A protein has these predicted regions:
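Conserved Radical SAM active-site core
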Residues: 1-120
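Auxiliary Fe-S-binding modules of radical SAM enzymes
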Residues: 15, 29-32, 115-116, 123-252
Length: 252
């Protein structure tokens, strides 16, 4: 909370998107609220909101299927717990993102099941008139690198495009689909714009996850390079803020 308060004091207008569901659960545990279940999670998120938290990222969802989760993501929070955190966040008025890590040991059926679960949670959120909801879905390709699953090949380019296109068709109740260029590569993100993505993320100067898993992953793009890539793909670049509102600079 001190970090949030300090940031808001120094930059009062800044929007803070922080803390994955995994980190929220960890905060509940170390603050002795982990045993309180949903109430403990709600207490933690409410306290973070009071000190400046504006929204949640979507990390940590991995793949919801229990078999896959137990085999590939031992020690991480379950899909059910991830959903609990985001459901509480939405009820408290926060928007969030949803992710899916694909291309490892899961099946295509597991991916579809994951998307259906996200879709159903968004439907519940809309039906209950929650002031928060999922803003974007982000399919993330598995990058073998030096992980424990390094012998796996990871998804092909065609598999990446199909997964994103299917997510856009299935998740029509989620406004945005992101082609996260730093994991997809900027070239793949260009193709994904043609397959249903409407967001490729920002400049990103350093992304520890991909840097650990693959030292060859490019870590930065200039604004000019991003705009050029978007235009080359046949689209007009638009700068947005965290809540997907268009940013205007110098009246443009």
């Amino acid at each position: 909370t001190t970090m949030l308060s300090t940031i808001k004091k120094l930059a009062p207008t800044i929007h803070i998107k922080a803390f994955t569901a995994v980190e929220i659960v960890h905060l509940a545990r170390i603050s002795k609220r982990g045993r309180d279940g949903i109430a403990g999670i709600s207490s933690v998120i409410s306290e973070l909101i009071e000190h400046g938290l504006g929204s949640l990222p979507g990390g940590g969802a991995e793949v919801f299927d229990e078999r896959v989760h137990d085999e590939a993501f031992r020690g991480k929070i379950s899909g059910e717990k991830w959903l609990d955190v985001h459901r509480v966040a939405h009820e408290l008025g926060l928007h969030s993102n949803a992710t899916m890590l694909y291309g490892h040991i899961e099946s295509r059926r597991d991916r579809i099941s994951h998307m259906i679960t996200i879709r159903e949670e968004q439907e519940r959120c809309i039906a209950s008139n929650s002031s928060g909801c999922f803003q974007a879905f982000i399919p993330l390709p598995f990058i073998p690198g030096v992980s424990e699953l390094s012998k796996l090949p990871g998804p092909s380019g065609i598999e990446n495009l199909k997964t994103l296109a299917i997510s856009r068709l299935m998740l029509d109740n989620i406004p945005h689909i992101k082609a996260f260029w730093i994991m997809q590569t900027i070239q793949m993100a260009q193709h994904m714009l043609q397959c249903g993505a409407d967001d490729i993320d920002g400049t990103v100067m350093w992304y520890d996850i991909t840097k650990v898993e693959s030292d060859t992953t490019n870590q930065s793009q200039s604004i000019r390079d991003l705009c050029r890539a978007i235009r080359d793909a046949g689209f007009n670049p638009v700068e947005r803020d965290t809540l997907y509102r268009q940013v205007e600079r110098d009246g443009k």
